């Protein structure tokens, strides 16, 4: 037994201290583990440099990798010396096997880096750079929109300590934003060939009612600060308030765009303003085939902003409704005011519909039409009553179709026989004493009707008893014989032959 203990002691002394430690899960006899120094603190810069390196590989030190292997408790050692030597050999074999198994297991968990994996990581880094570039582009759009609003300010207080060029990332803060310039921001990665260029600066534009502040974080040796705030807020005295020239803003914008292009960030303009002929960033108005800044799309006469209201075009220039109607709209001949909506054109003039009225009755003339006399408009009733012809039959005004006869004008329905009111079918009529008559009543008025048949007598006639008869219609009332020969007798205004009269009244 003492020999076994001595061999075990020699084994522990000869075993290298950097070999992996075998731990057991047995709670009865926990084995002491070797105390190692804590891992070094995490450094983001070191991690970033290791991450961006495409050719470096992580060194794998097998001696510093540890694993936990479940070790079952060994059986008790036989007191015999021969059995102790066998047990010692078994322990040595098991130790060597366990050491190789642990090493293989750890190496399988940490495979070596091949070039394909390194290439994939490089692509991920490029995508991150693109994302940062897109975020910088969004910030550029926000800054350019704020610069458009900045043009509308009349004056600002300006304090310049040293000249500097504006480059890098920008941010526009609206009222109510509480961002800090010291907070980390995502910016586009600078290529290696531009590392010697001046370090970009970031600045912040804060727009609020009565408060305009432009701050620049000093990264290089230059600093530009322009503010219009009280001295108690800004912490520095402003010598005097001066207006910012338009060229300063334009040059600042040009320098900003050139700096972004040098970093590989493309800036796209939305066109040139038709009024100022400068690039448009942010909101844009498209009208009349051109693009405009919203603050430059104004009325050509009164110079007020048109915005989303209606406008009119004249010779390629926009006008608001009020000025367009006052300048170019036709005017009413009565009230001499511009005609905005419906219009009546008559007698060489333009009129409001409610102002185009009859000269006599003052009623508006509608779709029924009007009549003109000496340059004045009249409704139909007043015109024909004053100046129109009168029907000879009904003494009413003749407005539409008429018949001219007997020296006058007649309504078609009024030109009929004066006695029986029968229309003249064939267009022929007879006139007696200035009146139109049919043939029957004409002969009746003249006494040329046959007393026997009551038809007009156009040929020979026989006069008897104060009446006229056709020769064949003068007959005896009793025997109906013709009385064209000889004499006849009369009784109660009826003719009789001699025989019938003697027989009846003799």
Curated annotation (Swiss-Prot):
Residues 15-62, 154-201, 221-244 are annotated as: Disordered. A motif (LD motif 2) lies at residues 87-99. Residues 271-330, 331-388, 389-448, 449-506 form the LIM zinc-binding domain. A motif (LD motif 4) lies at residues 248-260. A motif (LD motif 1) lies at residues 3-15. SMART domains: LIM. A motif (LD motif 3) lies at residues 139-150. GO terms for molecular function: metal ion binding; transcription coactivator activity. GO terms for cellular component: cytoplasm; cytoskeleton; focal adhesion; nuclear matrix. It is found in: Cell junction, Focal adhesion; Nucleus matrix; Cytoplasm, Cytoskeleton. PROSITE patterns: LIM_DOMAIN_1 (PS00478), LIM_DOMAIN_2 (PS50023). GO terms for biological process: cell differentiation; Wnt signaling pathway. It comes from the Eukaryota. The keyword Transmembrane helix does not apply. The keyword Transmembrane does not apply. Residues 52-62, 168-177 have a biased composition (Basic and acidic residues). Its main location: other. Functions as a molecular adapter coordinating multiple protein-protein interactions at the focal adhesion complex and in the nucleus. May regulate both Wnt and steroid signaling pathways and play a role in the processes of cell growth, proliferation, migration, differentiation and senescence. May have a zinc-dependent DNA-binding activity. Belongs to the paxillin family. PANTHER family: PAXILLIN-RELATED, TRANSFORMING GROWTH FACTOR BETA-1-INDUCED TRANSCRIPT 1 PROTEIN. The LIM zinc-binding domains mediate glucocorticoid receptor coactivation and mediates interaction with tcf3 and tcf7l2. The LIM zinc-binding 2 and LIM zinc-binding 3 domains mediate targeting to focal adhesions and actin stress fibers. The LIM zinc-binding 4 domain mediates targeting to the nuclear matrix. The LD (leucine and aspartate-rich) motif 3 functions as a nuclear export signal. This is Transforming growth factor beta-1-induced transcript 1 protein.
